[in-house]
Regions:
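Metal-dependent de-N-acetylase/amidase catalytic core
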Residues: 1-17, 97-101, 107-347
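Active-site rim/loop-helix segments in enzyme catalytic domains that contact anionic ligands
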Residues: 1-120, 142, 146-153, 157
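Short strand-edge motifs at loop-to-beta-strand transitions and within beta-strands
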Residues: 417, 425-433
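Surface-exposed, proline-enriched loop/turn segments that connect beta strands in immunoglobulin-like
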Residues: 349-353, 393-394
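Short, solvent-exposed loop/linker segments at the N-terminal edge
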Residues: 354-360
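Beta-strand-rich structural segments
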Residues: 361-369
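Proline-anchored loop/turn motifs at beta-strand termini and strand-loop-strand connectors
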Residues: 369-411, 416, 436
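Short glycine/proline/serine/threonine-rich loop/turn segments at secondary-structure transition edges
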Residues: 435-466
Length: 466
């Protein structure tokens, strides 16, 4: 199932961002149909973490509830296949109007947060959950709709937030802006209740499992069978897009070589050739995929990956900062992950303690299992540690691990002398990790600093925390 779902997203490049105000505002059915069904890269931007909501599962309110609801959103995205984003806005409670919301949230600062996400995620399409009018009810809902429309224009304007360019974040033109119709006559209908043979249920049913993750809001729902649709209104389009074309992605170049005109003629030919060979490998991998032998797809996928790497290298040399080079780099990483899954390679990292303190020590074991039928080469792990942390590899006695903390039935490392791992073999490495006395205590980045009014404070220009 996982292999098949991954393969769906490896041909072409479609990116969609949904924008709402709170956790549980998102249309999980649409997110699921796009991500799991169409292989699109999807994201949900919630302006807030739902800190002002109710709590049916515990006493936490305010920032504490925001922590819980953040986790619920992340759990929902694990199911529907999306990526989760936030702005710095704190959910202070109910507002009657957008004007009241913008009295609490500095409008320009909030818009900057949304534009930052548009320019870094770079969606082709935005779907706004709300209209930005009093029909949305809650003032924060109205504010979310207004922000979606304003950010659609601002993200493409180099005069808006020009300081982002110094951080490598360039303007981005979103091609289409839709909004949920909510009873209005929609211009586009997307099927969200289609049965998916890979999932064994419909996208809508999976979406309802995703929605049920919002436990603190008592959002548990059934998973009914039958057809379902989402109605959308086309709100705005970029120059050159025909608004009368009925397709959701109509008029948008969603191929892997979109933007290839940024390259010289020789580089274009090389990239086009590499992508054609990659797609052929991808097609053969899909044909070879079998539930009883998923590794049958590994060889054609590996051949396709080799061609993709060649195309990426050409694009990097010819136009290192181009959208094409970035797309090919991301796709190469995604195919590498898909290849490991198809080959039956499993990596497991286990520590002797889930909580450590500054000045403390912990043992970590890395286990690499080749569950497929092909030999794995260059099977050498590298621990990624925070600054100041150190790791020393320690010997594993032959036969150790047959009991005790690191599990039963595990023999000594079966790694070959040439660093390869035979089919069915397990390699193990154990490390003694030391934490420096001045190590920074871990915490939630959005609570590292005190709020400024109704806005969280965190490094606004660090995309790693968004």
């Amino acid at each position: 199932v996982g292999n098949g779902l991954q393969l769906r997203g490896l041909d072409g490049e479609k990116r969609v961002l949904m924008i709402g105000a709170h956790p549980d505002d998102e249309d999980t059915a649409l997110l699921t149909a796009l991500a799991r069904g169409m292989g699109a890269t999807t994201g949900y931007l919630s302006l807030t973490r739902g800190d002002g909501g109710q709590n049916h599962i515990g006493p936490e309110l305010g920032e504490g509830l925001g922590v819980i609801r953040t986790g619920e959103l992340l759990a929902a995205r694990e199911l529907d296949g999306g990526t989760q984003f936030f702005t710095r806005a704190f959910d202070y409670g109910f507002s009657k109007s957008a004007d009241e919301a913008f009295e609490k949230w500095p409008r320009e600062a909030l818009l900057r947060d949304v534009v930052w996400i548009l320019r870094t995620f770079r969606p082709h399409v935005i779907v706004s959950v709300f209209s930005g009018t009093p029909a949305d009810g809650h003032g924060q809902h109205q504010a979310a709709g207004i922000m979606a429309r304003e950010a659609f224009e601002a993200a493409a304007d180099p005069q808006r937030f020009p300081e982002m360019a110094a951080l490598g974040v360039e303007p981005w033109q979103v091609e289409k802006l839709y909004r949920r119709s909510w009873g209005d006559e929609g211009t586009h209908t997307l099927e969200t209740g289609r049965f998916d043979p890979l999932l064994g249920r419909s996208h809508f049913q999976l979406a309802m499992e995703s929605r049920s993750q919002h436990r603190s809001q008592d959002m548990g729902v059934a998973q009914p069978v039958g057809g379902r649709t989402t109605e959308l209104l086309l709100w705005e389009v970029a120059p050159g897009i025909d608004p009368t074309d009925p397709g959701f992605f109509a008029g948008i170049d969603t191929t892997l070589i979109a933007g290839i005109e940024a390259l010289d003629a020789a580089s274009r030919r090389a990239v086009e050739d590499g992508v054609v060979r990659y797609r052929n490998g991808l097609s053969r991998a899909a044909e070879a995929l079998s539930p009883s032998g998923p590794w049958e797809s590994a060889e054609p996928l590996a051949e396709g990956l080799s061609s993709l790497r060649e195309a990426e290298a050409v694009a990097r040399r010819a136009a290192p900062d181009s959208e094409l080079a970035q797309v090919l780099a991301r796709r190469t990483e995604a195919v590498e992950h898909a290849l490991l899954r198809a080959a039956g390679v499993t990596l497991k990292v286990v520590a002797t303690d889930d909580l450590v303190v500054p000045g403390g020590e912990v043992e970590v074991e890395v286990q690499l299992w080749n569950g497929g039928d092909s030999r794995v080469g260059n099977a050498v792990p590298r621990l990624s540690l925070p600054d100041g942390w150190t790791a020393e590899e320690i010997a594993i006695e032959e036969g150790a691990g047959g009991g005790g903390f690191f599990g039963r039935g595990v023999a000594g490392s079966q790694l070959g002398e040439d660093g390869s791992l035979a089919p069915g073999a397990l390699a193990r490495w154990r490390y003694h990790v030391r934490i420096p006395a001045d190590a920074q205590v871990s915490g939630l980045y959005f609570r590292d600093e005190a709020r400024d009014g109704e806005m969280y404070q965190w490094p606004a220009d660090d995309p790693g925390v968004w």
